[in-house]
A protein has these predicted regions:
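Hydrophobic, aromatic-rich transmembrane alpha-helices
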Residues: 4-17, 54-69, 184-196, 342-362
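Alpha-helical transmembrane segments of multi-pass inner-membrane proteins
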Residues: 129-157, 173-239
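Transmembrane alpha-helices of multi-pass inner-membrane enzymes
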Residues: 61, 191, 369-382, 387-429, ...
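A membrane-periplasm/extracellular boundary helix in multi-pass inner-membrane enzymes
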Residues: 148, 236-281, 298-302
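N-terminal signal-anchor transmembrane segment
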Residues: 3-68, 82-96, 149-150, 379-381, ...
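Membrane-interface helix-loop-helix junctions at transmembrane boundaries of multi-pass membrane enzymes
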Residues: 13-23, 66-77, 193-206, 243-252, ...
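Long extracytoplasmic/lumenal interhelical loops at the membrane interface
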Residues: 277-340, 359-361
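Aromatic-anchored transmembrane helix interface
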Residues: 52-55, 77-87, 97-121, 130-134, ...
């Protein structure tokens, strides 16, 4: 009684119930964890914040490992495949004296995201939605800050070596083309979170779509236009069930990504559509010089096809270019082949196939299934000319979320009748109430 009377005299801003209900404060722990694991490019490149993020990532990984051991969470097939996939590039990295620190940092960071998703997949509905909400809001904040930096002209200048010819503005999410690393995952997370509400379109989905489209238009990212068009076609097709399975599935999207890479990079099928590409996208069939990079990359990869060359200190750049500069492959599968050879490529496809099959077999509703398939298909096709496993590494979110789609958004994670949800390890406080001697809860806050 004394505590209650004292609490009534406190200012509203000091009310513990208010602090518990306040979204930024209540979710601060989880928001911090997600920020460390999904840090924007500018933060990772900062000479002070970059090393700090590496230390914090190791701490978060150790914390998650401890939670998995204490709660006896079994090691999943996606986790095993991801570890094997990363180990495939470890051997050539060590053998060729590559960037072992970068390999370890990326491995711990992405594995921690998977472990965080699997941890929350076992909690109750409220906790599962909390994870989706925090991840969605974090990426939306990134997009809004990035757009403000674009409009105000703030940021830095990204250059390669001493050649100012290649210098271009860099914002929170990196250079112009890197905005797609955040746009499409933000759209997916927003659609997944809003699928749990009764509204057809939640404000997070609307904000993700509008902010993404505005930045794509402002920065003139042709690759993102292709992805947006694919997403706009696939989403209603899945919702209308025009064709069950086939290409309109997660496994179909995985196969489509591999097939498009072979057709565009190896067979050069785009040469037959030169007029359409130039008319719609304003691009030539060389795809802004990417075909020249692929022509130079393939002979290099052929010299070490099985195990590749490992993670180098040039952030994956290995193709000789203008004035001694090195470039990345500008194709996701070619870059993975350089990092870990055909072994890494095979394990990467196995990871995508396993998680896609699990998502296809899940009992998620049509909105969830359509969102996963549409955005994943778009990113799979866009990875033909870009690399989304580097930088923020947001491409990994697709197999990670797909592997736990039913638990996160279906009924797999709900507690049994009479059993309360497990408390979140990073949530500030839980529900409180008064229980009568008969076991009836009379009041809950």
């Amino acid at each position: 009684m004394l505590f209650r009377s004292m609490r009534r005299t406190l200012p509203a801003v000091l009310d513990p119930d208010l602090l518990r209900r306040c979204y930024p404060l209540r979710y601060l722990g989880l928001m911090t964890v997600c920020f460390v694991l999904m840090r924007p490019i500018m933060v990772g490149q900062d000479p002070t914040l970059g090393p700090l993020m590496k230390v914090l990532t190791a701490a978060v990984f150790a914390w998650l490992v401890n939670l998995h051991i204490v709660r006896r969470i079994p090691v999943s097939a996606p986790a095993i495949l991801f570890v094997l996939y990363r180990l495939a590039s470890l051997l050539p990295t060590v053998y060729r004296d590559g960037d072992l620190l970068n390999w370890g940092y990326v491995t711990l960071s992405q594995l921690s995201i998977l472990m965080l998703i699997e941890l929350y997949a076992g909690y109750g509905r409220q906790e599962r939605r909390r994870l989706l909400r925090v991840m969605t809001d974090l990426l939306l904040i990134y997009l809004l800050i990035n757009y403000v930096m674009i409009m105000t002209g703030t940021g830095s200048v990204a250059s390669w070596g001493q050649h100012e010819f290649f210098a271009q503005p860099s914002y929170l999410l990196g250079i112009r083309t890197r905005v797609t690393d955040c746009v499409f995952p933000a759209i997916l997370l927003a659609m997944l979170y809003d699928s749990g509400s009764r509204r057809r379109w939640g404000w997070r989905t609307v904000l993700a779509l509008t902010s993404g489209i505005v930045q794509i238009v402002t920065l003139q990212v042709a690759t993102a236009w292709v992805g947006a068009a694919i997403m706009a076609i696939v989403y209603p097709a899945v919702r209308l069930r025009l064709r069950a399975g086939g290409l309109l599935s997660m496994r179909g999207a995985t196969l489509l990504g591999v097939a498009v890479t072979l057709l565009v990079v190896v067979a050069r099928v785009q040469t037959y559509f030169a007029a359409q590409i130039e008319g719609l996208l304003g691009k030539s069939v060389t795809m802004t010089g990417r075909t020249d990079l692929w022509d130079a990359a393939i002979p290099i990869l052929a010299d070490s096809p099985l195990f590749g060359y490992g993670i180098n200190s040039q952030f994956g750049a290995f193709i000789p270019a203008f004035k001694g500069l090195l470039w990345q492959a500008h194709n996701q599968y070619l870059q993975i082949a350089y990092d870990g050879g055909l072994v890494a490529v095979g394990l990467f496809i196995a990871l995508l196939w396993t998680t896609s099959a699990r998502a296809d077999a899940s009992r998620c509703d049509d909105r969830v299934r359509a969102a996963l398939i549409a955005v994943y298909t778009a990113m799979s096709v866009m990875s033909v000319s870009e690399i989304y496993v580097y930088n923020m590494g947001t491409f990994y979110l697709f197999p990670f979320l797909a592997s736990r789609a039913e638990e996160l958004l279906g009924g797999g994670g709900r507690p049994e009748p009479g059993e309360g949800p497990r408390p979140s390890p990073v949530a500030a406080g839980g529900p409180t109430g008064t229980i009568t001697p008969t076991g009836t809860i009379t009041r809950i806050r």
